[in-house]
């Protein structure tokens, strides 16, 4: 099973890349974690933001295969405890489809992406910086795996 984070934005600070890679490499090969970056359209003073969101959404969905699972990261999604995420991760492993975690740009996800979601996940009711969200997703997936495998990381 593959886990993919499809996120709008590229050229992250070094600390973000290092944090992401640290958790991605900790996961076993049967739970490979991959990052797919969608370039952020440049927003100017008179930018057509709605068009940019739509274009970014189309680019995100173009990276998703026909039968792959989509989990959107949304403020109004369902909050999962670590244990609940571990249960979901176990279900996804049994399902064996690729799981795509979708993180939008500064204005959020395109409605078309949200409409395709199999599940909606909220990391927090707080507004979080998108670079930090990448690391949090990687860490939480790793932590969920440690719960399932009995690893002492989650104690």
Swiss-Prot record:
It comes from the Bacteria. It is found in: Cytoplasm. Pfam families: SPOUT_MTase. GO terms for cellular component: cytoplasm. It is an enzyme of class 2 (transferase). S-adenosyl-L-methionine binds at residues 73, 104, 123-128. Belongs to the RNA methyltransferase RlmH family. HAMAP family: 23SrRNA_methyltr_H. Specifically methylates the pseudouridine at position 1915 (m3Psi1915) in 23S rRNA. NCBIfam families: PRK00103.1-4, tRNA_RlmH_YbeA. Homodimer. This is Ribosomal RNA large subunit methyltransferase H. It comes from Pseudomonas fluorescens (strain ATCC BAA-477 / NRRL B-23932 / Pf-5). The gene is rlmH.
């Amino acid at each position: 099973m593959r886990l993919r984070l499809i996120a709008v934005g590229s050229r992250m600070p070094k600390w973000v890349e290092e944090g992401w890679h640290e958790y991605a490499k900790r996961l076993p090969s049967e739970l490979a974690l991959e990052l797919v970056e969608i370039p952020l359209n440049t927003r100017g003073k008179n930018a057509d933001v709605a068009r940019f969101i739509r274009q970014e959404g189309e680019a995100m969905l173009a990276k998703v295969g026909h039968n792959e699972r989509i989990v959107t990261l949304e403020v109004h999604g369902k909050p999962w405890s670590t244990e609940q995420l571990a249960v979901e991760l176990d279900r996804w492993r049994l399902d064996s489809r690729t799981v795509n975690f979708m993180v939008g740009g500064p204005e959020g996800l395109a409605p078309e992406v949200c409409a395709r979601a199999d599940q909606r996940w909220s990391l927090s009711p707080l507004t979080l910086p998108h670079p930090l969200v990448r690391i949090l997703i990687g860490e939480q997936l790793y932590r969920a795996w440690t719960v399932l495998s009995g690893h002492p990381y989650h104690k």
